[in-house]
Amino acid sequence: MNNIRKTHPLMKIVNSSFIDLPAPSNISSWWNFGSLLGICLIAQILTGLFLAMHYTSDTMTAFSSVTHICRDVNYGWLIRYLHANGASMFFICLFLHVGRGLYYGSYMYLETWNIGVLLLFAVMATAFMGYVLPWGQMSFWGATVITNLLSAIPYIGTNLVEWIWGGFSVDKATLTRFFAFHFILPFIVAALAGVHLLFLHETGSNNPSGLNSDTDKIPFHPYYTIKDILGALIMITALTSLVLFSPDMLGDPDNYIPANPLNTPPHIKPEWYFLFAYAILRSIPNKLGGVLALVLSIAILTIIPLLHTAKQRSMMFRPMSQCLFWILVADLLTLTWIGGQPVEHPFVVIGQLASVIYFMLILLIMPITSMIENQLLKW
C-alpha cells in the first residue's frame, strides 16, 4: 500500500511543499522568515477575526467599541494587543526577509521576487487601513494625510480622493470601506503567498553561497521543520513579551484620544514601520514629487534584478558590496528615525541626505561597485 501522504491529492501538495521538499543543506537562519511570516499572517487573521466580532465600523461607536473590547470582552485586551503588535512583528520579519533576498541575490528568481514586492505593497495597504479603524486622533489624521496625497495626481487627483473618501472628507463612509478592505486583504495576501511559494518551489531555494545546490539537498522534514519551530518559538516569545510587558511601546499615545476633525495633532506620523517611506515623502518639497518618491522607495525593489551587475549571485564573497549593503541598512534606520521627528532643522536636511543616499546606493553605487568587484576577480 502506498503512503497516503504521497498519493492523496491534497496531502501530496503538503508533502511536496513541507515534508519531502528537497532543500539546500546550508541555508542559514535568514531562511526562517518565510515560515515566520506565514505564522504572523495566520495569527493576524485569527486575532482580527475575533476583533471583528466585537468591532463596529461607525464613526460614532468605533472608538468606544475598541475600548469595549479591551475592558469587557474576555481576554479582549490580549487579542487587541496581539493584533496590533503582531503587525509590528509581521513588518520586522518582512524587512528581514527582503534584506535577506537583497544580500544573497534571491531576487534572481524574478517571479518569486516580484510577487514578493506585490505582497509587501498589499501588507502595507492592509496595515495602513487597520491603523484607521480604532478611530483615534492619529487614525483620523493619518487617513486624511495619506489619502490626500492622491490629490497630487494630475487631472483626476481631487476626484479620486473624494471617490476613496466617499464624500468630501474622511468620514463614516471611509471608515466602513476601510474596514471592508482591511478584512478582505489578508485573504488576498494569503492567496498571493501561495503563488509566491508555488514559484519558489519551481526553482528551489537559493542558499548563502548563491551557487547551485542540486548536488547537496536534504529533506525539509525533519531538518528545517525543527529549525522553523525554533524560529517560531523565539518570535512568539518576543511577541508575547512585548504584548504582556509594554503593549503600547510601538503605538502612538495620540491614538487614545478619540478622532476630532477640528483639532490637528502637533506631529502627524504613521506607525514605525512606515516611517522610512514617510521620511522620503517629506524630504521632497513638491507634493507630486514626494508621492512619486514614496511609491518608488518600495517599487524600486522590482528593478533590482536589472541592476545586478555582479558575476556572483550572493554577497557572501563580495566584501565591498557587503559594506554598501550595511550602509543601506544604516540609511534606512536613519530614515526611520527622521520620519518620527518634527519637520525642523536639522532633521529636514538629514532626511533629504538620507533619501538621496538611499536612491543613489541602489541605482548607482551598488551596481558600479559590483562591476569593480568583477574586475578584481581577474587579479
Swiss-Prot record:
UniProt entry tagged with the keyword Transcription regulation: no
Annotated binding of a ubiquinone, by residue: 201
Biological process annotations from GO: mitochondrial electron transport, ubiquinol to cytochrome c
Gene Ontology molecular function, alphabetical: metal ion binding; ubiquinol-cytochrome-c reductase activity
Primary localisation category: mitochondrion
UniProt keyword tRNA-binding present: no
Necessary cofactors: heme b
Record's bilayer topology term: Multi-pass membrane protein
Binding, heme b b562: 83, 182
TM spans (from-to): 33-53, 77-98, 113-133, 178-198, 226-246, 288-308, 320-340, 347-367
Protein family (similarity comment): Belongs to the cytochrome b family.
Subunit structure: The cytochrome bc1 complex contains 11 subunits: 3 respiratory subunits (MT-CYB, CYC1 and UQCRFS1), 2 core proteins (UQCRC1 and UQCRC2) and 6 low-molecular weight proteins (UQCRH/QCR6, UQCRB/QCR7, UQCRQ/QCR8, UQCR10/QCR9, UQCR11/QCR10 and a cleavage product of UQCRFS1). This cytochrome bc1 complex then forms a dimer.
Protein known as: Cytochrome b
Natural source organism: Crocidura attenuata (Asian gray shrew)
